[in-house]
Amino acid sequence: MSGKTKRLMVMAGGTGGHVFPGLAVAHHLMAQGWQVRWLGTADRMEASLVPQHGIEIDFIKISGLRGKGLMAQLTAPIRIYRAVRQAQKIMRDYQPDVVLGMGGYVSGPGGLAAWLCGVPVVLHEQNGIAGLTNRWLARIAKKVLQAFPGAFPNADVVGNPVRTDVLALPLPAVRLSGREGPIRVLVIGGSQGARILNQTLPLVAASLGEQITLWHQVGKGALPEVSQAYQQAGQAGHQVVEFIDDMAAAYAWADVVVCRSGALTVSEVAAAGLPAIFVPFQHKDRQQYWNALPLEKAGAAKIIEQPQFTATSVSSLLAGWDRATLLSMAERARSVAIPDATERVAAEVVAASKSA
């Protein structure tokens, strides 16, 4: 890259669904010679995770309003104003060429500060239903991108950036052809686990017996209780762990996955080429349902809403899927994936920097 080194500021915080896609784009652009800095909050996961990736991070003080009391609502304008002023100072000191908003509370004040400083804002919405912050920022953004169709009416669909080790997995036809033995069921409730999965899957294991074998991530603190549930069901032989560090290896092992349908999980399942049973988290805007719907429409997954997620319903589904069916579903999942999402988002950042 000739001339002045281009500078990007990534705004993302709160959850892995915002932070990990931001890191993927950051690393891609750093490899192209860009300088990258991060805007986050000091009390969320980005505070420790981002520096581990060799990226400096600045903090502003901001938190969400949903579920907060009246006093928090009344003082919100003051807190937002202060956060915007903090972000403006950071922008002036760093002087980024582009700001990339990947979601989380930090994106609101950060995006407004960038706009006030004349810095182009590129937004990426990871979910099938746009969050409040991104809906507001879309009015001032130079470019709006979405992972799934429908979050914004006219935004480009670019997918969600996912980890390179997941993208590097062999295609389903290579990975799954010739497999024999019990169906391998990977159960993921996210790093915090999901109680409904932990309660139900031991009963599914008991129902299907030797037809399946499970690798079950139960989440922090749930291992003793869930292990005991498997033992009481006479199913102590399954692999039950608190957390899976190498998700790519878990995807490579699995024939089918049972999980929530957070945006990043859905995108990773598609990129890996895996059939899925999705259990959307019951949020008022049904965000996770809309994330999972494209894969169900493609014939790659089934959505079971939480009230209907029982040992009987799950056992019936799994028992009806033979290996040929699972391979077909896996190939359909892969066909709707957008494996070059990282490159697509990065290209829009580069384009915004040139037209600034």
Swiss-Prot record:
Gene3D superfamilies: Glycogen Phosphorylase B. It is a peripheral membrane protein. PANTHER family: GLYCOSYLTRANSFERASE, UDP-N-ACETYLGLUCOSAMINE--N-ACETYLMURAMYL-(PENTAPEPTIDE) PYROPHOSPHORYL-UNDECAPRENOL N-ACETYLGLUCOSAMINE TRANSFERASE 1. Cell wall formation. Catalyzes the transfer of a GlcNAc subunit on undecaprenyl-pyrophosphoryl-MurNAc-pentapeptide (lipid intermediate I) to form undecaprenyl-pyrophosphoryl-MurNAc-(pentapeptide)GlcNAc (lipid intermediate II). It comes from Yersinia pseudotuberculosis serotype O:1b (strain IP 31758). Pathway: Cell wall biogenesis; peptidoglycan biosynthesis. GO terms for biological process: carbohydrate metabolic process; cell division; cell wall organization; lipid glycosylation; peptidoglycan biosynthetic process; regulation of cell shape. GO terms for molecular function: UDP-N-acetyl-D-glucosamine:N-acetylmuramoyl-L-alanyl-D-glutamyl-meso-2,6-diaminopimelyl-D-alanyl-D-alanine-diphosphoundecaprenol 4-beta-N-acetylglucosaminlytransferase activity; undecaprenyldiphospho-muramoylpentapeptide beta-N-acetylglucosaminyltransferase activity. GO terms for cellular component: plasma membrane. It is found in: Cell inner membrane. Belongs to the glycosyltransferase 28 family. MurG subfamily. Its EC number is 2.4.1.227. UDP-N-acetyl-alpha-D-glucosamine binds at T15, G16, G17, N127, R163, S191, I244, A263, L264, T265, V266, S267, E268, Q288. InterPro entries: GlcNAc_MurG (IPR006009), Glyco_trans_28_C (IPR007235), GlycoTrans_28_N (IPR004276). The keyword Acetylation does not apply. This is UDP-N-acetylglucosamine--N-acetylmuramyl-(pentapeptide) pyrophosphoryl-undecaprenol N-acetylglucosamine transferase. It catalyses: di-trans,octa-cis-undecaprenyl diphospho-N-acetyl-alpha-D-muramoyl-L-alanyl-D-glutamyl-meso-2,6-diaminopimeloyl-D-alanyl-D-alanine + UDP-N-acetyl-alpha-D-glucosamine = di-trans,octa-cis-undecaprenyl diphospho-[N-acetyl-alpha-D-glucosaminyl-(1->4)]-N-acetyl-alpha-D-muramoyl-L-alanyl-D-glutamyl-meso-2,6-diaminopimeloyl-D-alanyl-D-alanine + UDP + H(+). The gene is murG. Keywords: Cell cycle, Cell division, Cell inner membrane, Cell membrane, Cell shape, Cell wall biogenesis/degradation, Glycosyltransferase, Membrane, Peptidoglycan synthesis, Transferase. It holds the Pfam family Glyco_tran_28_C.
